[in-house]
Amino acid sequence: MAFENKIVEAFIEIPTGSQNKYEFDKERGIFKLDRVLYSPMFYPAEYGYLQNTLALDGDPLDILVITTNPPFPGCVIDTRVIGYLNMVDSGEEDAKLIGVPVEDPRFDEVRSIEDLPQHKLKEIAHFFERYKDLQGKRTEIGTWEGPEAAAKLIDECIARYNEQK
């Protein structure tokens, strides 16, 4: 039986091209400007999280969605998860899922990070390696993992969330 990619609902906080780091305040039901990036860089993809998950850093599991056109903050995108980037942010594991919109035919054949242009993966890794430099914070970029490992990571983060409830 062939592997089926996980389909998730990605809750988008930050659109592609933004230098603003927005965070959704769940208690108040509003978006808040967390900070403007210190570096002259911009988010290389839609950035958000998966609701009802808990990653090792204590936050919901992060996700980047590669899109044709940027959505608005608060948009939920049905996303095919194609892998993730292992990284460490300020000493904590901070995996970044990578996915593509289910409802965009331009991505119908994209099932793995290997199906993306290598340059796009380099842009994403470079962004996360450097975006906190001017804040004096350190990030370390690890390996790229495929869709099977991403599915396992999602399941672990859902289980961790359910244990914490």
From Swiss-Prot:
GO cellular component, one term: cytoplasm
Binding site for Mg(2+) 2: D62
Residues reported to bind substrate: K21, R35, Y47, Y131
Catalytic reaction(s) noted: diphosphate + H2O = 2 phosphate + H(+)
Record keywords, A-Z: Cytoplasm, Hydrolase, Magnesium, Metal-binding
Chain positions recorded as Mg(2+) 1 binding sites: D57, D62, D94
Any one GO biological process: phosphate-containing compound metabolic process
Compartments reported by the entry: Cytoplasm
Main location: cytoplasm
UniProt keyword annotation of Magnesium present: yes
InterPro entries listed in its UniProt record: Pyrophosphatase, Pyrophosphatase_sf
Disulfide cross-links: none
PROSITE patterns attached to this UniProt entry: PPASE
Domain of life: Bacteria
Enzyme class, spelled out: hydrolase
GO MF terms held by the record: inorganic diphosphate phosphatase activity; magnesium ion binding
Cofactor (UniProt): Mg(2+)
EC number: 3.6.1.1
Function per UniProt: Catalyzes the hydrolysis of inorganic pyrophosphate (PPi) forming two phosphate ions.
HAMAP family named in the record: Inorganic_PPase
Oligomer and partners: Homotrimer. In presence of divalent cations the trimers aggregate to form a hexamer.
The name this protein goes by in its record: Inorganic pyrophosphatase
Organism of provenance: Bacillus sp. (strain PS3)
Underlying gene: ppa
